[in-house]
Every structure is written in structure tokens, then in C-alpha cells.
């Protein structure tokens, strides 16, 4: 494999995981903050809020997993290598 392609693949894999984690990380922090605020306002709605929060965490985390899949594809099944 061309060393330039290998180096670019490693850099792109690192960037794909790093950038894919920024948005969901910020979203999870915001969602958790609002969930705590909502539970503090209405303690009787804790179960519903927690369920919605965990479901939204799963959707947000799937975006990070997509970035990881792209990184693994670049590292181990590189489409640019001959």
C-alpha cells in the first residue's frame, strides 16, 4: 500500500471518530441537563422523562457508532488501497 494513502487513512479514521463524537457528546450533555431540570420541576414524571432520555441517548450514540464504522472501514477494509 502506498504510504501516503496509509497515512491519510489513519488521519481520516481518527478524525471520523473524533468529529462523530463531538455532536452526540454535546447533545447528551444538553439532554441530561434538561432531564434533571424536568425531574426537579416534576418529580412524579421521573419515569417518563428517564425513558425518553435513555431512548434519545441511544439515538445520539448511534451517530458515534457510525463514525466508528467508517474509521474501521478505512483502517481494515480500505477502499483506496490497491
Curated annotation (Swiss-Prot):
Look up and give the membrane topology term: Multi-pass membrane protein
Q: One MF term from GO for this chain?
A: proton-transporting ATP synthase activity, rotational mechanism
In terms of SUPFAM superfamilies, this protein maps to:
F1F0 ATP synthase subunit C
**Where does this polypeptide localize?**
Plastid, Chloroplast thylakoid membrane
- Asked if Membrane is a keyword of the record, the answer is yes
InterPro entries attached to this UniProt entry: ATP_synth_csu_bac/chlpt, ATP_synth_F0_csu, ATP_synth_F0_csu_DDCD_BS, ATP_synth_F0_csu_sf, ATPase_proteolipid_c-like_dom, F/V-ATP_Csub_sf
Site (Reversibly protonated during proton transport): residue numbering on this chain? 61
Q: Name one Pfam family in it.
A: ATP-synt_C
The UniProt entry, under Gene3D superfamilies, shows:
F1F0 ATP synthase subunit C
- Record GO cellular component, one term: proton-transporting ATP synthase complex
Q: Give the protein family.
A: Belongs to the ATPase C chain family.
The extra comment attached to this record reads: In plastids the F-type ATPase is also known as CF(1)CF(0).
Q: What is this protein called?
A: ATP synthase subunit c, chloroplastic
